[in-house]
């Protein structure tokens, strides 16, 4: 088996390959699948090394395909995310007890057995569970773990700078070719433009996304994650097993405060991102005034955006292309969770590729689009607000519902945040 690894000790553009148990060597631009005129041929190319891309690559490699994964970052790398995974994610990834034990020995893996939920500036409710319903992770560690586990050819530190069609193959960056391309580069995935006719540059993609925000459910978030020293640890009131969720007074978003061992993650996400910095500033001031966090934390907020499943205008397939995760706009509609949809869409994409038997035209990939809609919801055709209650009435009803323990446990947490009503992804589906 040929294995590529990517880490901080690997220079961008280099691939570390391993054959057998202990033979290591550095190569530049070498592929065991095919090498002609400086072009490396693979069975599939994945653009993006997050959970969606690495999961898809892992599944394809296990089925015997020769896969190349490229990412502009060198792993491990920081990633803006609240960072928790539910048991169905562990099941979908087929992580066995030994792998989990090895993971938690050297990485953050914080069991969650409770939540505190409230509307900002109002009294909260604590909901407890007898066993862990989720686990806090650091994307810095988790993504690097999944990428290493994929055991595919890696090109880290290499952004996708060009993409062109040659017959039935895609040629990436002029040197990497494959008949099937998986776009897993997140909300601003460069592959998405070839499916959805978007501008090529990152700045143009962001401008297009800003326009998108006025028509579709684009969520923007600001958040920070950092390690606490002993003094700061004693000043934070959040318990590691019980993240705190704070819903905005207009119910257009929510903030969170989540401690994972010695790490603290704080953030705020909203469906109306136009005044997000102001809302985030007010939220942090509220946390300090409430005594949840001290005022001297090193708070550098970082932003990201994503589309909610069932509202995304993006097409998820093209000729020889599949989009997965946030590139396809699959975040959970109420919580904004992206890791479970990323992992599951990565598995569904791998399954569609394997079932296509080398035929990757749109018709052959159509089952993947249908499966995404079945799993995560099809975009609504009618976006008219006719027949919906006025916002003031909806807000008043929401205030009252948030006071009910039954509603908080079974709707807000079990359904919206933990997805417990959704069955695990069936292997044969």
Residue ranges: model-predicted function:
Residues 40-50:
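Beta1/beta-strand and adjacent pyrophosphate-binding region of the FAD-binding site
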Residues 53:
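N-terminal Rossmann-fold NAD(P) dinucleotide-binding loop
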Residues 61-80:
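Glycine-rich FAD pyrophosphate-binding loop
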Residues 76-77, 94-114, 201-218, 365:
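A short alpha-helix-loop-beta-strand transition element characteristic
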Residues 89-145:
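A conserved beta-strand/loop capping segment in the N-terminal third of enzymes
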Residues 149-292:
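Predominantly flavin-linked oxidoreductase catalytic cores and closely associated redox partners
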Residues 159-162, 177, 274-353, 358-360:
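FAD/FMN-dependent oxidoreductases across multiple families
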Residues 351-429:
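C-terminal helical "tail/cap" subdomain of flavin- and related membrane-associated enzymes
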């Amino acid at each position: 088996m040929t294995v590529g690894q990517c880490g901080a000790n690997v220079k961008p553009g280099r691939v570390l390959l391993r054959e057998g148990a202990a033979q290591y060597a550095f190569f530049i631009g070498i592929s065991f699948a095919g090498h002609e005129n400086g072009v490396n041929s693979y069975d599939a190319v994945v653009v993006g090394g997050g959970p969606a891309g690495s999961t898809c690559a892992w599944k394809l490699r296990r089925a015997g395909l020769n896969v190349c994964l490229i990412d502009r970052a060198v792993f491990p790398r920081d990633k803006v995310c609240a960072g928790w995974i539910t048991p169905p994610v562990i099941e979908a990834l087929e992580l066995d007890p030994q792998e989990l034990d090895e993971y938690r020995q050297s990485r953050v893996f914080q069991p969650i057995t409770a939540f505190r939920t409230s509307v900002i500036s109002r009294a909260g409710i604590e909901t407890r569970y007898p066993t862990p319903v989720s686990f806090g992770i650091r994307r810095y560690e988790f993504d690097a773990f999944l990428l290493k586990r994929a055991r595919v050819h890696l090109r880290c530190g290499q952004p996708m700078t060009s993409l062109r069609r040659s017959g039935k193959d895609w040629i990436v960056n002029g040197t990497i070719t494959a008949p099937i391309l998986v776009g897993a580069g997140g909300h601003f995935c460069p592959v998405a433009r070839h499916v959805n006719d978007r501008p090529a540059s990152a700045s143009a993609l962001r401008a297009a996304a800003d326009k998108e925000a006025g028509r579709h459910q684009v969520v923007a978030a600001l958040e920070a994650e950092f390690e606490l020293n002993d003094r700061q640890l004693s000043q934070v009131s959040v318990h590691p097993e019980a993240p705190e969720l704070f819903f905005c007074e207009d119910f257009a978003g929510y903030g969170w405060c989540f401690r994972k061992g010695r790490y603290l993650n704080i953030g705020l996400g909203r469906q109306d991102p136009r005044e997000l910095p102001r809302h985030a500033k007010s939220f942090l001031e509220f946390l300090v005034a409430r005594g949840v966090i001290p005022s001297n934390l090193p708070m550098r907020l970082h932003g990201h955006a994503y589309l909610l499943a069932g509202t995304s205008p993006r097409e998820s397939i093209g000729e020889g292309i599949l989009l997965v995760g946030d590139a396809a706009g699959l975040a959970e509609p109420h919580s904004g969770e992206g890791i479970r949809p990323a992992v599951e869409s990565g598995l569904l994409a791998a399954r569609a590729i394997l079932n296509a038997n080398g035929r990757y035209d749109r018709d052959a990939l159509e089952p993947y689009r249908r499966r995404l809609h079945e799993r995560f919801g099809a975009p609504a055709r009618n976006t008219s607000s006719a027949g919906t209650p006025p916002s003031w009435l909806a807000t008043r009803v929401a205030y009252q519902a948030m006071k009910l323990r039954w509603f908080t446990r079974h709707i807000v947490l079990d359904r919206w945040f933990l997805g417990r009503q959704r069955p695990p992804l069936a292997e044969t589906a």
